[in-house]
Regions:
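Mature catalytic core of soluble alpha/beta enzymes
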Residues: 1-329
Length: 329
């Protein structure tokens, strides 16, 4: 996960009203912090928005539109649900299937949504994997009608929901005249402008091999910083570790040479989706993907051997006690 080092000093806080709120939504702990005259009001509105989006997109809430869609195999989506499905299907194409919202039946076979973790048998996995292909999701963006080609298919927008939510929170902050803000949605960090004193926010990037320590710190303004790694959620069975980032190619936890991927972008939704996608791709494909889309995002890749790769767009803003290699276009 990425975490912010909160360094706004007391004198800055006097000039700017600070308001902060902690909440639990989307299966994670979140902290929203804003500075400005209407900070408290903005933070309260933002928290309401987060909870509304959670209720809309949750796969486990019987009243959510995604739950209903998964039950019925078809639906007319809300504007936001439709937008997210559209973005997800676009990412599916661009990442050549690495980002796949239809992987949900496979996630269930592993017990990740319910935390009833177990390694599925080969037959179950084969059966679920046959359903897991976003190519078989038919979505019409004009009518917002969606249907699945196979009855037992299910989707999960969890791979981009938090990134989208953080962008929406930023919109609320801007509408309420907030001059400076930082939010952490379960380690997804997004910032508005710099800190109240005008300096950069400093976002620490967690060490996947030793959570609680960091591989380095990013100095940023107005960016989303989102990290994915197998260390975030996993279980052990028969001495083996299985993490929650499933490779749609084989239905098993991705094991393609990376232990964590951090994405830095203006677009929270994109950053969220790509952090998972590049993790699944592995180091070579991930670097190639960045080179082809370097105008959209930057990245920090941590390989299985602990070596760190940083794309050149953020190399000057990343400080680390470890050596790192700069990925050039």
């Amino acid at each position: 996960d990425t975490e912010t080092e909160s360094e706004a000093s007391g004198e800055d806080a006097d000039k700017e009203t600070e308001a902060s709120k902690d909440l639990f939504a989307m299966d994670t702990y979140m902290t929203l912090t804003a500075y400005g005259e209407h900070a408290q009001e903005a933070v309260d509105k933002a928290a309401e928005r987060v909870e509304a989006l959670d209720a809309l997109l949750s796969t486990g809430n019987e009243n959510s539109e995604i739950y209903q869609l998964n039950q019925n195999g078809e639906a007319t989506l809300s504007e936001e649900g439709g937008y997210l499905v559209e973005r997800a299907l676009e990412l599916y194409k661009k990442t050549e299937g690495a980002f796949d919202i239809a992987i949900y039946p496979v996630m269930q076979a592993w017990g990740f949504p319910t935390q009833d973790y177990h390694v599925p048998d080969d037959d179950t996995l084969k059966e679920k994997l046959a359903l897991a292909d976003a190519f078989k999701v038919n979505y019409d963006k004009d009518t917002r009608k969606i249907f699945f080609f196979f009855f037992c298919m299910e989707i999960d927008l969890g791979g981009i929901a938090k990134g989208y939510t953080s962008s929406k929170v930023m919109d609320i902050f801007k509408e309420n005249g907030i001059s400076s803000a930082v939010i952490s949605l379960g380690g997804n960090v997004q910032t508005l402008n710099g800190k109240p004193d005008g300096s950069d926010w400093r976002v620490a990037v967690e060490n996947p091999a030793d959570t609680g320590s960091y591989i380095g710190v990013l100095s940023i303004k107005d960016k989303a910083v989102i990290t994915s790694g197998g260390y975030e959620r996993y279980f052990k069975q028969d001495g083996k570790t299985y993490h929650h980032i499933i490779d749609p190619a084989n239905g098993y936890p991705a094991n393609n040479g990376l232990t964590s991927v951090t994405i830095v972008s203006d677009d929270g939704t994109l950053a969220d989706g790509l952090s998972t996608s590049l993790f699944i791709m592995g180091p070579e494909k991930a670097q190639k993907y960045w080179k082809e889309h370097s105008d959209e995002f930057d990245t920090i890749l941590v390989k299985d051997d602990g070596s760190i790769l940083v794309s050149e767009g953020i190399a000057d803003y990343f400080t680390s006690e470890s050596d790192f290699t700069i990925i050039k276009k």
